[in-house]
């Protein structure tokens, strides 16, 4: 306990100003660590004579502990049996043996947070990825003859390069082109020629002396 005057017995400031919280608190008011005792509940094979800790989860049903005697057969099913070893030991109303239970060679271990139970939790599923637009021209496989023109529709005004697309490969491309998720960009030689002409005009205008 701190030897200083408690907060509620301190007088207010003479000037009427509100005191700050850091002026009222001190390091002596903080208690030291109380230790870390993790083994807070223990129920041994001896039953009531070998247990300590908070056993409020039993709710007064101490007859469920190992090593205790059952008064009569469970006829009306009023007892709640949360432990599997008790359910198997009281089949057909037989009493438990006086000695230590063969099913309980060690003390009962309660579940630990972060133990094997944590591995059974469902993992959060990742959201589905949005569909990607096919902006790049797909590379033809070697089985299709190595022709690049089978993957694009020839333009009506573009000059023919001499490589004619196959008739069998033209139909599936038309069906893919009609899809909203497919986008095919064809930069033909006509657009490239226009870009090169503009670049040449800019170079000529820079070389003309003013």
From Swiss-Prot:
Residues 122-171 are annotated as: Disordered. GO terms for cellular component: cytoplasm; cytoskeleton; cytosol; endomembrane system; membrane; microtubule cytoskeleton; phagocytic vesicle; plasma membrane. PROSITE patterns: CRIB. It is found in: Endomembrane system; Cytoplasm, Cytoskeleton. InterPro entries: Cdc42_effect-like, Cdc42_Effector_BORG/CEP, Cdc42_effector_prot_2, CRIB_dom. Pfam families: BORG_CEP, PBD. The CRIB domain mediates interaction with CDC42. This is Cdc42 effector protein 2. It comes from Homo sapiens (Human). The lineage of its organism: Eukaryota, Metazoa, Chordata, Craniata, Vertebrata.
